[in-house]
């Protein structure tokens, strides 16, 4: 049995010893059946939150309104969630009410896909009321119950379906795909932050080309930030070898290179990305558009290591040669890496010239910066002084 389950087993055993049902549920059970790596587990129980808190010494109310209590066991943290049913979904994401129950099957019934509605007990026996194992065997992504109802409850489930297709190389069953196509407009009610998470997971999947084909077939791109009408760009984007990526930044750079938005900053901000990512990708954009492989010393200097490394990463994804080592060597060989590395400062210029401060100081330092980069002058204080026409002291 997987070590992750074995380590968490005492949590289930404490709950069952206290007279409650407890199971491993969701993605961890699915991934176990698929022999995929399991990083963490989710636990569902018939114990109500207050009952869970009585059983364990160390607990945290991380989502108690929805029945989730985080418990600490053997220096590990586990989310333990009470079986529940949910009321109507008025905003296509959150239920109007949550009701705690004692039935495992009713709890599994509210989940998105049958492959995610399998439970495993403390003896590692599987409880599979919706034939999730059969779906896994057939590589099918099938909604629990009516697909249209599941998507109406949480519109993000449509994007999750496409993401699972990419990650698992599965296929949506016909009813689920039809419901996805007919209800795709509900995606507009989903927060951008949640969409961004699913988008990144989808791109990283081994079956990204098939996932992108389905995404475009159902016109999901219409409801993704800045991608309406970009079928051609997304087809190209989906054809690249994203298995070679090492950073998420490369995904965003690849997207702006194919879409070529009028305002790269605004496009990236619409995806609610961190400012650091927006700044890096925006700076790398013009270099990446040219599929730059050969760089002048001045270009390496102004771009910086983070930018030329990102452009090189995207080139690899697009089937070009990996020039990282050569570029890094050329960058390290530069006489300076920023204006701060110059052997003199504006204060030196004022002292040597006897003149007042003004725009000329920046202009002179810019000229010197270029001269040092082009090897016209060594970055040495006395040589710079002579080069600028000042007499040595």
From Swiss-Prot:
One of the GO BP terms on file: RNA repair
Keywords of this entry: ATP-binding, Magnesium, Metal-binding, Nucleotide-binding, Nucleotidyltransferase, RNA repair, RNA-binding, Transferase, tRNA processing
The protein's Enzyme Commission number: 2.7.7.72
GO MF term (any one): tRNA binding
Residue numbers binding Mg(2+): 40, 42
Subunit structure: Homodimer.
Listed name of the protein: CCA-adding enzyme
Organism: Listeria monocytogenes serovar 1/2a (strain ATCC BAA-679 / EGD-e)
């Amino acid at each position: 049995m997987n070590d992750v389950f074995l380590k968490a087993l005492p949590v289930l055993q404490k709950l069952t010893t206290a007279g409650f049902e407890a199971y491993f549920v969701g993605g961890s059970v699915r991934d176990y059946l698929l022999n995929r790596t399991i990083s963490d587990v989710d636990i569902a129980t018939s114990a109500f939150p207050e009952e869970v808190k009585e059983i364990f010494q160390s607990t945290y109310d991380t989502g108690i309104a929805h029945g989730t209590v985080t418990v600490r066991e053997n220096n590990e943290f586990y989310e333990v969630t009470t079986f529940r049913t949910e009321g109507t979904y008025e905003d296509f994401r959150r239920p109007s009410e949550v009701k705690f129950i004692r039935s495992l099957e009713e709890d599994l019934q509210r989940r998105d896909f049958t492959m995610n509605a399998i439970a495993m007990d403390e003896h590692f026996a599987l409880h599979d009321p919706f034939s999730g194992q059969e779906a896994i065997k057939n590589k099918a992504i099938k909604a629990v119950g009516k697909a249209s109802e599941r998507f109406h409850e949480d519109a993000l489930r449509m994007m999750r379906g496409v993401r699972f297709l990419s990650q698992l190389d599965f296929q949506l069953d016909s009813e689920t795909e039809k419901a996805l196509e007919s209800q795709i407009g509900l995606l507009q009610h989903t927060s951008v932050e949640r969409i961004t998470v699913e988008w990144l997971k989808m791109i990283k999947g081994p079956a990204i080309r098939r996932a992108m084909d389905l995404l475009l077939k159902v016109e999901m791109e219409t409801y993704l930030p800045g991608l309406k009408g970009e079928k051609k760009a997304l087809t190209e984007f989906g054809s690249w070898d994203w298995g070679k990526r090492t950073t998420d930044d490369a995904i965003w750079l690849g997207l702006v290179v194919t879409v070529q938005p009028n305002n790269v900053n605004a496009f990236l901000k619409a995806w609610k990305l961190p400012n650091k990512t927006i700044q890096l990708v925006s700076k790398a954009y013009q270099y990446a558009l040219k599929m730059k492989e050969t760089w002048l010393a001045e270009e390496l200097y102004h771009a910086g290591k983070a930018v030329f490394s990102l452009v090189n990463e995207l080139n690899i994804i697009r089937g070009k040669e990996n020039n990282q080592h050569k570029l890094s060597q050329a960058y390290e060989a530069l006489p300076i890496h920023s204006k701060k590395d110059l052997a003199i400062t504006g204060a030196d210029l004022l002292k040597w010239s006897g003149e007042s401060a003004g725009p000329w100081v920046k202009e002179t330092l810019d000229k010197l910066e270029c001269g040092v980069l082009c090897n016209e002058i060594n970055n040495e204080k006395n040589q710079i002084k002579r080069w600028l026409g000042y007499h040595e002291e």
